[in-house]
Amino acid sequence: MNVKYIGLSEINGPLVALDHVSGISYDEMAEIKLDDGTRRLARVVEVEKDRAVLQVFEGTKGLSLVNTTTSFQGKPMELALSTEMLGRIFSGAGKPIDGLGEIFPEKYRDINGSPLNPVSRTYPRNYINTGISSIDALTTLIRGQKLPIFSGSGLSHNKLAVQIVRQAKIADENGQDFAIVFGAMGVKNDVADYFKRCFEETGVLQRVAMFLNLSNDPIIERILTPRCALTCAEYLAFEHDMHILVILTDMTSYAEALREFSSSKGEIPGRKGYPGYLYSDLASIYERAGIVKGAKGSVTQIPILTMPNDDITHPVPDLTGYITEGQIVLDRNLDQTGVYPAVSILPSLSRLMKDGIGEGYTREDHQMVSNQLFAAYAKVQDARSLASVIGEEELADTDKAYLKFGTLFEKHFIDQGFDVNRSIDETLDLGWSLLSTLPKSELDRVDEEHLEHYYSAEKAKALFAED
């Protein structure tokens, strides 16, 4: 029997409270009917004895304590799912906003997902090619991995997200499809328009399902956005055998919405005002990436977050780093010199990279090239520090060679432009050309066989003659 409750006990910001209710569950959906017949959706966010607190999706403006009618639906929020979602644009709550009408649902699923038994997970292997050298060679993205991008306010993370969406691909295995689910939280209208325009102009929108939550949309919708996006991804991956890449931006906006939501409920704040359950809440999102035994599809995540004041110890990047399997860090100093993408190589890493590259996946020399580029670039930083103290002219020849390598590495390897899409072979060959500008004796992370095969000082000299 569907019981309707007339009247509200309290209205406080986006929250409403009802007393003398029974049989109500946490996270249950409800429909609120106003005096004028308008209907709004709400979600139960707190239950205590016979009192329930609900958050209204569209806000509480116009609600009355007396005549408002509330009916509970007896189930959590569910998302209508279909393969038709690819090529469509949805609100953060999963409603179509592209003017193309409703989708015809094949199934409905709880947006909170089903918890994955750790024993049923398969270790992620094989890689996703992004066409971006600094990612593919040095912080390789593996299928089923969760690899965040740590950015800062004003850096080019939106541009990088668009490039990844446009260029990302997998090696074709058994004709399996690859698609992208893109979730944007708290973005401005111009940024949302930029995403839509870029996807439409490049023709990739047909393989993308977009979930857009704008900065002026309700915060409860911002909290729902990543869950709706991941529910869509899980459906396509595990029921239609597709490989899905989920890009979520900006997780800092999500965390701030969670902080505001927690504050409105009167909860005791933790670090920097964020709720004490921020870690477990973020984990409930990030841990939905992976590969399941017996399933042919996979869900890979790239959460993007902006670090307030470029502080990597801020609670959001700090906790994200604990949960995820590496990070790609963008550097403001590189960005200011015009380098794009401004990936800071040394603090970036991919913890699952070693098991998804090499012979049979990318190329047999991939790990060695990656290790040697990391080691050489670390020595570049040492040489630059020394040069700032004693002057470049006083450096040894080896240190001068590293300074030149660093300049060439940033100019030709890290900086590759928005429209450049490199294959893994092109990336590794470029890495060898750069390493060939160094004395052969300095390349101690590469075995002799590959050194003889790929090292060519003459080729490097001709390639970088203008530099």
Task: Mark where each language-model region is.
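Acidic-enriched and Gly/Ser
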Residues: 1-4, 10-130
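P-loop NTPase nucleotide-binding/switch module
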Residues: 68-70, 77, 84, 96-146, ...
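Conserved catalytic network of the ASCE P-loop NTPase/AAA+ motor domain
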Residues: 140-142, 168-176, 200-205, 235-240, ...
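The Walker A (P-loop) glycine that initiates the GxxxxGKT/S ATP-binding motif of P-loop NTPases
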Residues: 151-152
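Conserved P-loop
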Residues: 155-206
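Conserved P-loop NTPase motor core
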Residues: 175-194, 211, 215, 226, ...
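Phosphate-binding/switch loop-helix module in NTP-utilizing enzymes
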Residues: 221-258
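Conserved catalytic/coupling modules of large nucleotide/cofactor-utilizing molecular machines
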Residues: 253-254, 260-467
